[in-house]
């Protein structure tokens, strides 16, 4: 017997300080060095921090739970991608792409035309995502990650020439 299940609807929404518990919960599931609820609260207290999250309807996730998120800093001339995380059971569904497109479009709408990020040298899926948006390797930070001593690659983006939704 087949059961019809409701179609999952995905929404990418701007997050705020009331989302700190959901953000830190997702971080603890996805990150080796997760941000805490307090770290998110402190970041949201500043005017340069922005975050977007994936929420699903008709999903086993609770309405406040996040399937993924992206956090960035805006400076007058640059958007810095701080973190992007998607629940393991929701990866390979385009959520990372939706989050990145949303964050870059938001930055572009405020007049920002440059992007920067750091990524673990071993994180091939993330590197592929970033390069698909036009990010190019600009350098390397040796021994950057405290947990493993792994190098970080520095990527930059000229959003005057980028595709915000490849």
Predicted segment positions?
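Conserved hydrophobic beta-strand within the GNAT/NAT acetyltransferase core sheet
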Residues: 81, 115-119
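Conserved catalytic-core motifs of GNAT/GCN5-like acyltransferases
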Residues: 118, 136-153
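Acyl-donor (CoA/ACP) binding surface of acyl/acetyltransferases
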Residues: 93, 97, 142, 151-153, ...
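Generic structural signal for helix capping and beta-alpha/helix-loop junctions
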Residues: 44-45, 96, 124, 147
């Amino acid at each position: 017997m087949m059961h019809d299940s409701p179609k999952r609807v995905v929404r990418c929404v701007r997050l705020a300080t009331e989302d700190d518990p959901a953000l830190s919960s997702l971080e603890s599931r996805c990150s080796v060095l997760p941000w805490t609820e307090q770290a998110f609260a402190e970041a949201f207290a500043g005017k340069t921090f922005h975050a977007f999250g994936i929420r699903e309807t008709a999903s086993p996730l609770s309405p406040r739970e996040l399937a993924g998120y992206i956090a960035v800093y805006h400076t007058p001339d640059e958007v810095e991608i701080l973190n992007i995380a998607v629940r393991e059971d929701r990866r390979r569904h385009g959520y990372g792409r939706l989050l990145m497109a949303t964050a870059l479009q938001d930055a572009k709408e405020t007049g920002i035309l440059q992007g920067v990020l750091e990524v673990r040298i071993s994180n091939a899926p993330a590197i592929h995502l970033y390069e698909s948006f036009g990010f190019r390797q600009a350098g390397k930070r040796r021994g950057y990650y405290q947990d493993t001593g792994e190098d970080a690659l520095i990527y930059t983006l000229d959003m005057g020439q980028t595709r915000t939704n490849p």
